[in-house]
Amino acid sequence: MRCPFCRHDDTQVVDSRVSEDGAAIRRRRRCSACDKRFTTYERVELALPAVVKKDGSRTEFDRRKIVASMKLALRKRPVAADAIDAAVARIEYQLLASGEREVRSEKLGELVMNELRQLDTIAYVRFASVYRRFEDVSEFADVIEEFRRAAPAKPPRKR
């Protein structure tokens, strides 16, 4: 594997271990030329369905896009990176289990919203506001009211 720092193609694996979610192997590598260390992840490559966009065009499923959009929604929220990876893995599993060769972008967005709903309600509202193209405050209020109806009553916060 090439070193990302000096582009030399001779690197050694210093340490290998299974990631916390068990879906990847984490490897620490050292470049023999510049002696810098870096981390790589090895995952099984699966045949995920193509994504059909709203305009009808098709594109490959890109895990990085899902992770990036979830991280944006979760920005400055107390959610660990491992939890995001696990959520994306669940989305991928659902897509694989469906057996479909294509998935509409709307369906993919709904899967992301379902995962965000479980991770962090603020992130869910952020993502939903962009994904569903909220146009006024009442749409935010409707989503928040959904949560109030679904969530059990919490005792008042002590200050």
UniProtKB/Swiss-Prot annotation:
Cofactor section: Zn(2+)
PROSITE patterns recorded: ATP_CONE (PS51161)
Disulfide bonds: none
Chain intervals annotated as zinc finger (unnamed): 3-34
Top-level lineage group: Bacteria
Swiss-Prot/TrEMBL keywords: ATP-binding, DNA-binding, Metal-binding, Nucleotide-binding, Repressor, Transcription, Transcription regulation, Zinc, Zinc-finger
InterPro entries tied to this protein: ATP-cone_dom, NrdR-like_N, RNR_NrdR-like
Note on how the cofactor is bound: Binds 1 zinc ion.
GO biological process entries: negative regulation of DNA-templated transcription
Domain ATP-cone: 49-139
Leader sequence segment: none
One Gene Ontology term of the molecular function aspect: DNA binding
Described purpose of this protein according to its UniProt entry: Negatively regulates transcription of bacterial ribonucleotide reductase nrd genes and operons by binding to NrdR-boxes.
Entry similarity comment: Belongs to the NrdR family.
Annotated NCBIfam families: transcriptional regulator NrdR
Protein name: Transcriptional repressor NrdR
Source organism of this protein record: Burkholderia thailandensis (strain ATCC 700388 / DSM 13276 / CCUG 48851 / CIP 106301 / E264)
